[in-house]
Amino acid sequence: MLPKVLFLMGPTASGKTALALELAENHNCEIISVDSALIYRGMDIGSAKPSMEELARGPHRLIDIRDPSESYSAADFRADALAEIAQIIRMGKTPLLVGGTMMYFKALLEGLSPLPSADDAIRADIQAEADVKGWETLHDQLRDIDPVSAERIHPNDPQRLSRALEVYRISGKSLTELTQTKSAPLPYDVVQFAIAPRERKVLHDLIAQRFRIMLQQGFIDEVTQLKARGDLHLDLPSMRCVGYRQCWQHLDGEFDYDTMVEKAVAATRQLAKRQLTWLRSWPELNWLESGAEGNLVTLMRHCR
């Protein structure tokens, strides 16, 4: 019988953390965070990181493991999560993976393709060629070597277009060919849950309410301190997190406070929409309604 692992996924502001803490207090499980914002130290308010009181109730693994100046890939997450899962199981407990970064969940379940590392010289050659010939011409090149990727990647998406060409020039194989290679299935009985409100308006209201609370908790001061470090900028993955980018731009004088709030809430709602799009096509998923009384009982039944 394979060891059991629980996934609790859902859009932002759907109540994942509260339900996970309830389960941690009522069952012999440990929480692993699956969130690309919670990994960063010093980004507490805007990422809705669990409070000290909540962490005392249910410690979370894989939070505060990177400085905001550092990158962290899906491959990094997969390696770290597999190590944490194995350790929790050795302790005789059930791993509970909680979060909304769907790419991390997907990487953990399916593995990652063995793509070559970036090559700065080849990338520079591609950029120089694009400067002379234009990205449309390079897109035609991609269509010749990898029509599937060319259909998926728009000519106006130079980052992904460049990467697809770079992979081919390094390996001699197309991105499509390489991404068909998957890892072996996880050696666990993975039970997957998603939680979300039944009505979209409820989620939208929760998102707006939570951002207002973040502002009351000192979110602008948090971003001000990050900005004052001098080594962070908006091109870093950490500063692309929703809320942080909009607040940074407000502090730069790009728009006023009310516009910042409007843009941050809109960006968060767009994130939630993308998360729900992922989840609607997710196989073998058990749905829970945010705030429903029977959620804890349902989760505990699957823990046995």
Swiss-Prot record:
<dbReference type="GO" id="GO:0052381">
    <property type="term" value="F:tRNA dimethylallyltransferase activity"/>
</dbReference>
<protein>
    <recommendedName>
        <fullName>tRNA dimethylallyltransferase</fullName>
        <ecNumber>2.5.1.75</ecNumber>
    </recommendedName>
</protein>
<feature type="binding site">
    <location>
        <begin position="12"/>
        <end position="17"/>
    </location>
    <ligand>
        <name>substrate</name>
    </ligand>
</feature>
<dbReference type="InterPro" id="IPR039657">
    <property type="entry name" value="Dimethylallyltransferase"/>
</dbReference>
<keyword id="KW-0067">ATP-binding</keyword>
<feature type="region of interest" description="Interaction with substrate tRNA">
    <location>
        <begin position="35"/>
        <end position="38"/>
    </location>
</feature>
<feature type="site" description="Interaction with substrate tRNA">
    <location>
        <position position="123"/>
    </location>
</feature>
<keyword id="KW-0819">tRNA processing</keyword>
<comment type="similarity">
    <text>Belongs to the IPP transferase family.</text>
</comment>
<feature type="binding site">
    <location>
        <begin position="10"/>
        <end position="17"/>
    </location>
    <ligand>
        <name>ATP</name>
    </ligand>
</feature>
<keyword id="KW-0547">Nucleotide-binding</keyword>
<feature type="site" description="Interaction with substrate tRNA">
    <location>
        <position position="101"/>
    </location>
</feature>
<comment type="subunit">
    <text>Monomer.</text>
</comment>
<feature type="region of interest" description="Interaction with substrate tRNA">
    <location>
        <begin position="240"/>
        <end position="245"/>
    </location>
</feature>
<keyword id="KW-0808">Transferase</keyword>
<dbReference type="InterPro" id="IPR018022">
    <property type="entry name" value="IPT"/>
</dbReference>
<feature type="region of interest" description="Interaction with substrate tRNA">
    <location>
        <begin position="159"/>
        <end position="163"/>
    </location>
</feature>
<comment type="function">
    <text>Catalyzes the transfer of a dimethylallyl group onto the adenine at position 37 in tRNAs that read codons beginning with uridine, leading to the formation of N6-(dimethylallyl)adenosine (i(6)A).</text>
</comment>
<dbReference type="GO" id="GO:0006400">
    <property type="term" value="P:tRNA modification"/>
</dbReference>
<dbReference type="GO" id="GO:0005524">
    <property type="term" value="F:ATP binding"/>
</dbReference>
<dbReference type="Pfam" id="PF01715">
    <property type="entry name" value="IPPT"/>
</dbReference>
<dbReference type="InterPro" id="IPR027417">
    <property type="entry name" value="P-loop_NTPase"/>
</dbReference>
<keyword id="KW-0460">Magnesium</keyword>
